[in-house]
């Protein structure tokens, strides 16, 4: 009703930006006639206009028109009006909700080009290394054509490579890399080690995934601490002995476990201790983690075991997260449960949440297919508005009603039947599952029925082929099982993706002959021992060694290449080998060559031209098959998407649905659910249990009931609220840490950049003297009762150079005079100390100042992080005492922070006065001065 009275706020917003689009379209004809050189020249012209005082908004229409034309010339893609609209919204610091297949990647080129003109740098943030690389290679061509530099950050890069890439006008990087680089920069010991520039503007692709789904997980850089590994093993054995409901309760909702009195008694008896919480020999932490590992962390759901290591599986994307570990000893507990080597436990050195990381950008925009459901959260936490961009073509997707089964087994059998029917009809099917285990169970069912299918989950052998599998998921009768949103970012094109197939064929011939051998195992694939090496991948084979093969599965290709096309391809590769050298390029550079060859960008490189001719010929041959198949699949109803469980957020369900019906194609979606699914079991409560009893139906008969659907939606809303509250709590607590983090990092950066830190150290010393005076002198007592002896002793403790000072020198002075006298003495002592040190090596004192300040900041900040963690644990319990834990955390956290700052000052003063370097001819780096 309100909408009718006030009008749709989204429509009002779109209307506000419409004049920009009209102006861009009017400029199109003028821009079209420019030569390539003139089009490139526009970049310098825009920079001059900005230097003369024009704003980015002033040049927006012309800049966007230039990017549109560059996109048409380089990629053969012209931005639609709705994509232009998306670009304007991103530039204005909002979230653009754009449906799958509407070309979000292309939209990002508009605001990133415009904002890069200021020279302050733009980050385009994606969810994984593969997408960052793909976008930098693909969309980066538009920017490179227009004269801007494009950087790419990959997890395997060295600090100097990172520095170079962050210096570029536009840098493509994943959310985790940008976060870890930020933390590492704030642990650097010299400015030369800092890799990032100050943040300016970023565009986040899949913004919901990064700012909502990952917001509960902080980024942590940690160092190792020694803990006895046998405790983990013993605790794992205890956990196996203890029984659920008798010895402990499991709270699946809060993902926590609580020991009962019987449980405590049993555990203490088995361990032969009297108290699990004994500070001298603590066991509680180990036992709780072991039970969590047993009950809440399941193999092939939350993690997989690979090469004797426990590797986390991302619950939202189904991808593995190598290198990431659960903290607080939980990862070690799981390692003990799985009987693999237990890695040392870690201590947090630096941490930040994605929420606070991205709030460091003065301006940010984001794109996703699904943001409206989380609009309130985006506005409250990030002050980001969500604007829905209309689709370019009318949507023809049909969302069928849910089918609910009583038992899980009935649901899976029905899904297998539906896959078989669709396969028979020649319609492609995409099945989204929530875990590796479930995807493999369905795969087993389909195998039994003899239905050919592709499996895409976190198992390493499948991850390698991710883009390849998704690119062919639209072929006639294809059945693809994928965990969650694996394959996000790769479009499912009906009839198959001829461009991608041609690119695979090009890689197959080109890569083995051009990639440097030592580069091969960077992204290596484990091959079975004894197999011959793949196509051209060097002679001989070392069993168990990782060897890279670029050979795609033969069934991917719709047809054999003609003799002429194959000849053309071989000649192009031979020519490349002659020009570049045999197996001479790093893998990333070779990938880049393939990417450029597969696009339309003008090039002077004769190798690229030859490779491009071969690529175009192959694509043309494949297209004859895929275009016929496309029409056939469209005629049969397009892609059918099956959801196998409702997720904890409607948004993730919508992402899965969004794979079907892209760009006006037909398609359909249906969710198959059972009353045993986690969502209904954990959050549906007694109501669902009652319904289970009431429905006296067969296990494989679907139930359709309005009451059930309402229960389901209610459960989903409950989960969304529950997780939103957790994220809000994480944010509020981290907000306290954030203010402290910013203060300490700003202080640290001042020290790193500061040329002369002498004044700062003297201020530290004066402040320390003031604190000593205030501690030993009680102004309410007569001066003869002041503890001047103790005061002087304490001063000498800090500054041994003042050993001649006597208490009687201070007897006739007031408090402010004593302070002024000590300030003067400290200055003299510091000059003396500096002269002593600089005799050993000129300028050594300056290095020592920087070294000691940074060292004390880092050590005490590390200890402070642990104190804050402990404080957070303890204030949680005060909630029972009618106190607000957050207020307690803020006030006590502030006290701890002030104590830390005082200790930094005192430690630096003490360390510098006590510093006695050994005379030596040369001191190479400040870190050798210990």
Swiss-Prot record:
Catalysis performed (reactions): ATP + H2O + cellular proteinSide 1 = ADP + phosphate + cellular proteinSide 2
Source superkingdom: Bacteria
A Gene Ontology biological process term: protein transport by the Sec complex
Bilayer topology annotation: Peripheral membrane protein
GO MF, any single term: ATP binding
GO cellular component, one term: cell envelope Sec protein transport complex
Subcellular location: Cell inner membrane; Cellular thylakoid membrane; Cytoplasm
Residues that, per the record, bind ATP: 83, 101-105, 491
Entry keyword set: ATP-binding, Cell inner membrane, Cell membrane, Cytoplasm, Membrane, Nucleotide-binding, Protein transport, Thylakoid, Translocase, Translocation, Transport
Main location: membrane
EC number(s) recorded for this UniProt protein: 7.4.2.8
Pfam family, one: SecA_PP_bind
Enzyme type, top EC level: translocase
Matches recorded under HAMAP family: SecA
Quaternary structure note: Monomer and homodimer. Part of the essential Sec protein translocation apparatus which comprises SecA, SecYEG and auxiliary proteins SecDF. Other proteins may also be involved.
PANTHER family: CHLOROPLAST PROTEIN-TRANSPORTING ATPASE, SECA INNER MEMBRANE COMPONENT OF SEC PROTEIN SECRETION SYSTEM
Function per UniProt: Part of the Sec protein translocase complex. Interacts with the SecYEG preprotein conducting channel. Has a central role in coupling the hydrolysis of ATP to the transfer of proteins into and across the cell membrane, serving as an ATP-driven molecular motor driving the stepwise translocation of polypeptide chains across the membrane. Probably participates in protein translocation into and across both the cytoplasmic and thylakoid membranes in cyanobacterial cells.
Family stated for the protein in its record: Belongs to the SecA family.
Protein name: Protein translocase subunit SecA
């Amino acid at each position: 009703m309100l909408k009718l009275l006030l009008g749709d706020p989204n429509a009002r917003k779109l209307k506000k930006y419409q004049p920009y689009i009209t102006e861009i379209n009017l400029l199109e004809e003028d821009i079209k006639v420019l030569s390539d050189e003139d089009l490139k020249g526009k970049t310098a012209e825009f920079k001059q206009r900005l230097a003369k005082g024009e704003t980015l908004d002033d040049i927006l229409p012309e800049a966007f028109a230039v990017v549109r034309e560059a996109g048409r010339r380089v990629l053969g893609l012209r931005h639609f009006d709705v994509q232009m609209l998306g670009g304007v919204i991103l530039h204005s610091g909002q979230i653009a909700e754009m449906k799958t297949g509407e070309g979000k990647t292309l939209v990002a080129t508009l605001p990133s080009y415009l904002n890069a003109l200021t020279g302050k740098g733009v980050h385009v943030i994606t969810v994984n290394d593969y997408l960052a690389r793909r976008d930098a290679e693909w969309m980066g061509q538009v920017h490179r054509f227009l004269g801007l530099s494009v950087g790419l950050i990959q997890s395997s890069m060295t600090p100097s490579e990172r520095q170079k890439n962050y210096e570029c006008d536009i840098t493509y990087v994943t959310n985790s890399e940008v976060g870890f680089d930020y933390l590492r920069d704030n642990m650097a010991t010299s400015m030369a080690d800092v890799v990032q520039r100050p943040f300016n503007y970023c565009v986040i692709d899949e913004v919901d995934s990064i700012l909502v789904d990952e917001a509960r997980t902080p980024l942590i850089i940690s160092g190792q601490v020694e803990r006895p590994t046998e405790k983990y093993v013993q605790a794992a054995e205890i956990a196996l002995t203890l029984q659920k409901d008798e010895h402990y309760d499991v709270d699946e909702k809060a993902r926590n476990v609580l020991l009962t009195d019987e449980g405590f008694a049993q555990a203490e008896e088995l361990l032969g201790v009297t108290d699990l919480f004994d500070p001298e020999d603590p066991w509680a932490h180990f036992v709780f983690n072991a039970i969590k590992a047993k009950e809440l962390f399941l193999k092939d759901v939350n993690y997989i075991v690979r090469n004797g290591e426990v590797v986390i599986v991302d619950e939202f994307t189904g991808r593995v997260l190598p290198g990431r570990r659960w903290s607080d000893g939980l990862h070690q507990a799981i390692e003990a449960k799985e009987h693999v080597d237990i890695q040392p436990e870690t201590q947090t050195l630096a941490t930040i949440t994605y929420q606070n990381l991205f709030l460091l950008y003065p301006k940010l925009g984001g794109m996703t297919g699904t943001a409206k459901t989380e609009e309130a959260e985006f506005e409250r936490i990030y002050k980001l508005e969500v604007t829905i961009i209309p689709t370019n073509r009318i949507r023809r997707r049909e969302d069928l009603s849910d089918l609910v089964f009583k038992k899980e087994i009935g649901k899976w059998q029905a899904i297998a039947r539906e896959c078989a029917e669709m396969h028979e009809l020649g319609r492609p099917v995409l099945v989204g599952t929530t875990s590796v285990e479930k995807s493999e169970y369905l795969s087993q069912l389909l195998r039994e029925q003899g239905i050919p299918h592709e499996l895409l989950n976190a198992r390493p052998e499948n991850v390698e082929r991710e883009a390849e599998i998704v690119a062919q998921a639209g072929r006639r009768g294809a059945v693809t099982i994928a965990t969650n949103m694996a394959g996000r970012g790769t479009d499912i094109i009906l009839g198959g993706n001829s461009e991608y197939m041609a690119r695979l064929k090009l890689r197959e011939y080109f890569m083995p002959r051009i990639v440097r051998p030592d580069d091969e195992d960077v992204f290596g694939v484990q091959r079975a021992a004894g197999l011959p090496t793949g196509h051209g991948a060097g002679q001989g084979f070392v069993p168990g060694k990782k060897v890279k093969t670029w050979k795609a599965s033969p069934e991917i290709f719709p047809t054999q290449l003609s003799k002429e096309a194959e000849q053309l391809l071989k000649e192009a590769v031979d020519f490349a080998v002659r020009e570049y050298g045999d197996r001479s390029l790093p893998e990333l550079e070779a990938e880049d060559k393939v990417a450029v060859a597969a696009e339309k960008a003008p090039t002077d490189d004769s190798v690229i031209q030859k490779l491009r001719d071969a690529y175009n010929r192959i694509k043309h041959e494949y297209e004859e098959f895929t275009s016929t198949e496309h029409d056939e699949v469209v005629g049969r109803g397009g892609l059918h998407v099956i959801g196998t469980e409702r997720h904890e957020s409607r948004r993730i369900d919508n992402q899965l649905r969004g794979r079907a019906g892209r760009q006006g194609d037909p398609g359909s979606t249906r969710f198959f659910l059972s009353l045993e699914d986690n969502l209904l079991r954990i959050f549906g409560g007694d109501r669902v249990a009652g319904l289970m009893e009431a429905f006296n139906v067969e296990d494989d008969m679907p139930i359709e009931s309005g009451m059930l659907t309402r229960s389901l939606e209610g459960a989903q809303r409950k989960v969304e609220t529950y997780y939103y509250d957790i994220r809000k709590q994480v944010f509020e607590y981290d907000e306290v840490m954030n203010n402290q983090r910013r203060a300490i990092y700003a202080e640290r950066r001042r020290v790193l950049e500061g040329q002369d830190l002498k004044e700062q150290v003297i201020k530290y010393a004066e402040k320390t003297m003031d604190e000593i005076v205030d501690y030993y002198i009680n102004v309410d007592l007569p001066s003869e009762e002041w503890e001047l002896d103790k005061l002087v002793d304490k001063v000498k403790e800090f500054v041994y150079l003042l050993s001649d000072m006597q208490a009687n020198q201070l007897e006739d002075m007031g408090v402010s005079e004593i302070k002024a006298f000590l300030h003067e003495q400290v200055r003299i002592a510091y000059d003396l100390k500096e002269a002593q040190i600089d005799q050993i090596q000129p300028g050594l004192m300056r290095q020592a100042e920087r070294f000691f300040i940074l060292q004390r900041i880092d050590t005490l900040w590390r200890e402070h992080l642990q104190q804050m963690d402990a404080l957070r644990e303890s204030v949680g319990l005060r909630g029972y005492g009618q106190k607000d834990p957050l207020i307690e955390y803020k006030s006590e956290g502030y006290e701890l922070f002030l104590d830390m700052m005082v200790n930094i000052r005192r430690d630096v003063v003490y360390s510098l006065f006590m510093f006695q370097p050994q005379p030596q001819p040369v001191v190479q780096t400040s870190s050798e001065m210990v």
